[in-house]
Swiss-Prot record:
Top EC class, one word: ligase
Reactions this protein catalyses: tRNA(Val) + L-valine + ATP = L-valyl-tRNA(Val) + AMP + diphosphate
Binding sites annotated in the UniProt record for ATP: 527
Entry annotated with the keyword NADP: no
InterPro entries: aa-tRNA-synth_I_CS (IPR001412), aa-tRNA-synth_Ia (IPR002300), Anticodon_Ia_Val (IPR033705), M/V/L/I-tRNA-synth_anticd-bd (IPR013155), Rossmann-like_a/b/a_fold (IPR014729), tRNAsynth_Ia_anticodon-bd (IPR009080), Val/Leu/Ile-tRNA-synth_edit (IPR009008), Valine-tRNA_ligase_type_2 (IPR022874)
Keywords on record: Aminoacyl-tRNA synthetase, ATP-binding, Cytoplasm, Ligase, Nucleotide-binding, Protein biosynthesis
Localization (cell): Cytoplasm
Protein name: Valine--tRNA ligase
Function summary: Catalyzes the attachment of valine to tRNA(Val). As ValRS can inadvertently accommodate and process structurally similar amino acids such as threonine, to avoid such errors, it has a 'posttransfer' editing activity that hydrolyzes mischarged Thr-tRNA(Val) in a tRNA-dependent manner.
Gene Ontology cellular component terms for the protein in this record: cytosol
Entry annotated with the keyword S-adenosyl-L-methionine: no
Pfam families noted in UniProt: Anticodon_1, tRNA-synt_1
Length: 872
């Protein structure tokens, strides 16, 4: 055992143990068939280079679970993946190099994206190590590596073989800024201020009609006008034809139950496409397709003189033209929900494009999800709500570069689509030829490789398969997925869909969901509000362990939590307390302490060990259910109050002056309870617990130790020890309140309990600094009047010049007689200078003292299960 420094230096300790853990493979997954697996499907984060506090919360939760399960003897696989592909990296590379991706070859652009991603990953890995996360870095993976997108392509091919994947032309969400299709889950609706335009359509052979729209720029794409069939304003007009102003095409008035008659004029134009409702009407009524918006968000040749205008430019110019032509009746402000790209916040368009899709089997997804244990369980309802609201299949093709290639070729002569064979993957169709050679339909060997790539969620949605060794290993559900509630509709949804489609299994046994992290002021974190906190900032000012504890105590998993600096400060104070306990313990235990045989425990020892065993069970129950906040509070309460405040105070006398057997018993119980505490705390505060553990007679790392299993002890002895601790704490509290030194001597202490039972007063007497006697029953104590306390502000103004004499008469009177007169008459009367004066009760108080049956003055204290008489 090495000497424990007087104070704990987190900077030094954290750097030391980060290096030691990495060098010693403390967190390696062994693949031990004798132990149960605990595999975590870690979310591969997008490598932004910045592990923000929201990311850190999720990784804290995963790390708490990983460390706890190692203590439980499980073979833990805590991998680290990186979700590398995607538009943000492409945009950043374009900005950094001042290029457009089409300015260079696909290979060169991808190479630059990889270089940028590597730099970002390195920065995030350093933050993860700083925070003490215990990943097995031998199981790190990157979705941009060939070995990963090989399996992404393999799963794509297997799903295509099972008819989950298909190619078709269909209206899709399209981001004109990103110039790619995006899935429903990547569209976020925002409430924005817009304008409602009232536009007149001239009747072909009938009266005009007025429609209301927020998108006059889509007039060249108008294919019909729709009204509610029950709207009397349009009775007899269904089937009439009208000319679209400025652009001239004729459209028909149709009836549909989905038209909202209360919106605008009750008549709406149907365009291809303004929104999903337009798509539904277009399909249901077999309308023409008149696309007018280009992939980059401009109008095409159908817009005539407005061709080439951006959407916003076209809106303004067409509205102006309508006003000049007399077709624009009025404009009014309106609130509208606008679907926007979640990456760049650009309003999406709906374009009809040939794309690759994955079928969404809502029933299969929900049935699979029901077999997963959700923490908290109401998070399943979020998945259910999203799934039931799905209207379209998942469009998985993207018109980008930095992503997993879709393994397909098109025959240049006959249009046949050829998918790669599983033996070919990984494959890049823009560089590689299909193994089939000639086209099986026409015999041509002229192939055009698919340039579209896969949605990045196609990568990350196979993460549980990849970490579990699929396809080399038969897939079995991993134990845990931890993720934020904001990506239930994406990562959770897609993973359940894909795993069920490929393996007919659930992806994970348990799904643990975390919420968002708000600032100390309760608002969403932002630099403009001044409440933004980076994890590194907390570590630098306090420590990684303090940050980790604050994350655990912020709230229950699933709920949004508030980052609070006071929790960080409290954690730092607790760590100081823990270090002081370790320092004290190290002065009394040695290498032989753990091996003491049959220690002669006293009641206090039995009590602390029983409490420790109970706490270990409670904390384990909480950890099993991912109640990290409750688990940490329970163990901190035990360490601070039971172990430090109560037990250490009780045994100090034995440790310093006790006989060898008594001292050894206290040393052993102290070692057992402290070493157990360090193990229970280690998932939350890995650095200080490892440093403290290294100063105890314990083997290896605390993180590879076993979950504590202290002897439960004798129940009766535990109850006696509990009472001893209560009495000691009660007397200690009284001394503190009275400003007395805690080591102040007492003449004696009498403890009255309900039943006659032996109580070990050895430690208690040492602690309270006086002999302790145990009595059965209720003490005989009475309040005895011993004096008066004059209320001069009440008495003086009434008696004025006689006040002094009245005070003298009160102070010289027998307090007991004064009390009796008050009880009888409600006041006191005196003769002063031949005059009777009446002294009201508010003019003085009777001072009473507690007296024991012996007549001695005594202090009466109430403990939970005893009445304590203190004789000074």
């Amino acid at each position: 055992m090495s000497e424990v420094p007087d104070s704990y230096d987190p900077d030094e300790a954290e750097q030391k143990w980060r290096d030691e853990w990495l060098e010693s493979d403390v967190y390696s997954y062994d693949g031990d068939e004798e132990r149960p697996d605990y595999i975590i499907d870690t979310p591969p984060p997008y490598p932004t280079g910045n592990l923000h506090i929201g990311n850190a919360l999720g990784w804290c939760y995963m790390d708490y679970a990983a460390r706890y399960h190692r203590l439980q003897g499980d073979d833990v696989l805590f991998p680290q993946g990186w979700d590398c592909h995607g538009l943000p990296t492409e945009v950043k590379v374009e900005e950094n190099r001042d290029i457009h991706r089409t300015d260079v070859s696909r290979e060169q652009f991808r190479e630059w994206c990889v270089e940028h991603t590597d730099e970002q990953i390195a920065a995030m890995k350093e933050t993860m190590r700083t925070l003490g996360f215990s990943q097995d870095w031998d199981h790190e993976f990157r979705t941009m590596d060939d070995s990963y997108w090989q399996e992404t392509q393999r799963s794509f091919l297997q799903m295509a073989d099972s008819d989950y994947v298909y190619q078709d032309e269909h209206p899709v969400n399209w981001c004109p800024r990103c110039e790619t299709a995006i899935a429903d889950a990547e569209v976020e609706n925002e409430d924005r201020e817009g304008t409602l335009y009232y536009i007149t359509f001239s009747g072909a052979d009938n009266d005009d009609i007025e429609i209301a729209t927020t998108r006059p720029e889509l007039l060249p794409a108008c294919v019909a006008i729709a009204v509610d069939p029950d709207d009397d304003r349009f009775e007899g007009r269904v089937g009439d034809r009208f000319e679209v102003p400025i652009f001239g095409q004729e459209v028909e008035l149709i009836a549909d139950d989905d038209v909202d008659g209360d919106f605008g004029t009750g008549a709406v134009m149907i365009c291809t496409f303004g929104d999903k409702q337009d798509v539904d009407w277009w399909a249901e009524h077999d309308l023409d397709l008149r696309p007018v918006v280009t992939e980059d968000g401009h109008l095409n040749e159908r817009a005539g003189e407005f061709e080439g205008r951006s959407i916003d430019e076209a809106k303004d110019e067409i509205a102006t033209a309508l006003s000049k032509s007399g077709h624009l009746h009025k404009e009014e402000p309106t609130e509208q929900s606008v679907g926007c790209c979640w990456r760049c916040d650009t309003p999406i368009e709906i374009l009809s494009k040939e794309q690759w899709f994955v079928k969404v089997d809502q029933e299969e997804i929900l049935e699979t999800a029901q077999d997963i244990a959700w923490y908290p369980d109401h998070m399943y309802e979020r998945l259910e709500e999203w799934t039931e609201g799905m209207e379209w299949d998942w469009v998985i093709s993207r018109q980008r570069v930095f992503a997993t290639p879709i393994p397909a070729w098109e025959c240049a002569d006959c249009g046949h689509i050829e998918l790669a064979d599983e033996s070919e993957v990984p494959v890049d169709p823009t560089n590689d030829e299909p193994a089939v050679g000639s086209c099986p339909e026409c015999g041509s060997d002229d192939w055009v490789g698919e340039t579209d790539v896969m949605d990045t969620w196609m990568d990350s949605s196979i993460s549980p398969l990849y970490v579990a060794g699929w396809p080399d290993e038969t897939f079995e559900p991993v134990q845990l997925r931890e993720q934020g509630h904001d990506i239930i509709r994406t990562w959770a949804f897609y993973t359940i869909l894909r795993t069920a489609a490929v393996t007919d299994e659930i992806p994970w046994e348990e799904a643990l969901i975390n919420g968002m992290v708000f600032g100390d002021d309760g608002n969403k974190m932002s630099k403009s509000r001044g409440n933004f906190v980076q994890p590194e900032e907390v570590v630098e000012e306090h420590s990684a362990d303090a940050f980790r504890q604050a994350m655990a105590l912020g709230g229950q998993p699933g709920s949004d939590i508030q980052f609070q600096w006071k929790e960080v400060t409290s954690a730092s104070r607790f760590q100081t307390k823990l270090w002081n306990i370790t320092k004290f313990a190290s002065e009394h235990i040695d290498e032989s302490t753990p091996d003491i045989e049959a220690p002669a425990y006293r009641d206090a020892d039995e009590w602390i060990l029983a409490r420790c065993a109970r706490v270990a069970d409670e904390v384990a129950d909480d950890m099993d259910e991912y109640r990290f906040d409750s688990a940490l509070r329970t163990v901190r309460e035990f360490v601070w109050h039971d172990l430090a405040d109560d037990y250490l105070e009780l045994i100090k006398g034995r440790l310093y002056e006790g006989r060898p057997g008594e001292r050894k018993a206290a040393e052993h119980a102290l070692f057992v309870s402290l070493s157990a505490s360090l193990r229970m705390l280690s998932p939350f505060a890995p650095f200080i617990t490892e440093e403290a553990w290294s100063h105890l007679p314990a083997d290896g790392s605390v993180h590879n130790a076993a979950w504590p299993d202290p002897p439960a002890g004798d129940e009766a002895a535990e109850e006696r020890g509990e009472l001893i601790a209560e009495v000691a704490a009660t007397i200690r509290g009284w001394k503190s309140d009275e400003g007395k030194p805690l080591n102040a001597d007492l003449e004696r202490v009498e403890v009255y309990i309900d039943e006659d039972r032996p109580l070990d007063t050895y430690d208690l007497a040492d602690t309270v600094n006086g002999p302790v006697y145990i009595e059965e029953g209720t003490p005989s104590v009475e309040l005895v009047p011993v004096g008066v306390d004059i209320e001069h502000s009440e008495l003086g103004p009434v008696f004025r010049d006689k006040a002094g004499e009245v005070v003298g008469r009160l102070e010289s009177a027998d307090p007991a007689e004064l009390q009796a007169e008050l009880d009888t008459d409600g006041h006191v009367e005196f003769e002063v200078d031949g005059e009777t004066v009446t002294v009201e009760p508010e003019m003085f108080d009777i001072v009473e003292e507690q007296r024991a049956e012996s007549g001695e003055e005594v202090v009466v204290l109430e403990a939970d299960d005893a009445t304590v008489l203190v004789f000074e």
